[in-house]
Swiss-Prot record:
The keyword Membrane applies. InterPro entries: GPCR_Rhodpsn (IPR000276), GPCR_Rhodpsn_7TM (IPR017452), TRH_rcpt_1 (IPR002120). The gene is TRHR. Its main location: membrane. This is Thyrotropin-releasing hormone receptor. One of its GO terms (molecular function) is thyrotropin-releasing hormone receptor activity. Residues 54-63, 124-146, 218-268, 322-395 are cytoplasmic.
Amino acid sequence: MENGTGDEQNHTGLLLSSQEFVTAEYQVVTILLVLLICGLGIVGNIMVVLVVLRTKHMRTPTNCYLVSLAVADLMVLVAAGLPNITESLYKSWVYGYVGCLCITYLQYLGINASSFSITAFTIERYIAICHPIKAQFLCTFSRAKKIIIFVWSFASVYCMLWFFLLDLNIAVYKDTTVVSCGYKVSRSYYSPIYMMDFGIFYVLPMVLATVLYGLIARILFLNPIPSDPKENSNTWKNDMAQQNKTVNSKMTNKSFNSTIASRRQVTKMLAVVVVLFAFLWMPYRTLVVVNSFLSSPFQENWFLLFCRICIYLNSAINPVIYNLMSQKFRAAFRKLCNCHLKRDKKPANYSVALNYNVIKESDHFSSEIEDITVTNTYLSSAKTSIGDTCLSSEA
């Protein structure tokens, strides 16, 4: 994806450099950075998909959107990062005409799907927190799956436009021939498409996210007590007291405060994802806009590398954010690793009675770090008899 070349040399792909002018130092730095970032990102995003699909309590609408985002990021890392490595090694396009079409298509599909996935979970968070009654029938897992299918279907059809713009460009020099995946039309034809992408998949999602997270912050941080009558604390206390007067009466305030803290934490985590998306995509998007108005586009190799690294970081960093800011994701990642390490060991049979006290809030459909409080008495006894379990054996 580059708008940084002139009509006489129309390269495509994620900001591929002018290979005939790169130095050995540039090649080494490119290969090492791309391998490191893309490798970690691929592993991290695969883990996100696995923990959500294999852990029952992680299958929430918000996590459904995060799986969509992880798949899109995987597509970007594989379709954009790996071709950059081969071009740095061979200084030429090695995947042929079909590879040129398919790889470029997958790059744009991943980028556009990730942008819409972020927009989808932003809207879902807004409804869940600012309109908790509506969230009970709008923020459901089945509806989230339908929205994701629509997002990917729309992005798939939209990105087919690139099939009609791409071709292999061959440059013949005295001692070598360089093949590149580029455009078969002049820059005046494909620049408007870049500008349309800029508006639909960057400006619009970021403006919408800014407005919605502002409204969320006003409700969640300035007035944390939910306005939904079903969540009235006094009613909740009375109902819980009738069910378990001895244990639950001591946990009412703590559990309710824990729910509020959980809602804040998940909102902070998703807001960080959006902010990083905005800042890490800004160098590339800015370059595209600026080059659209320059007669001789700016294409300094080191700056192009910087733009690429920012894009790869955006696709690779989300699993790190989940691990740092979500206790449930952190525990699920740990269980996934332990499950593979202990796969050959047969777990001991056990039978332990646990008393669960679930806090039901109107946005429980969408909170991936929603707390399930276990009484201290049973928890202490459970710790002595329950070992590590794999993700598929969640209570």
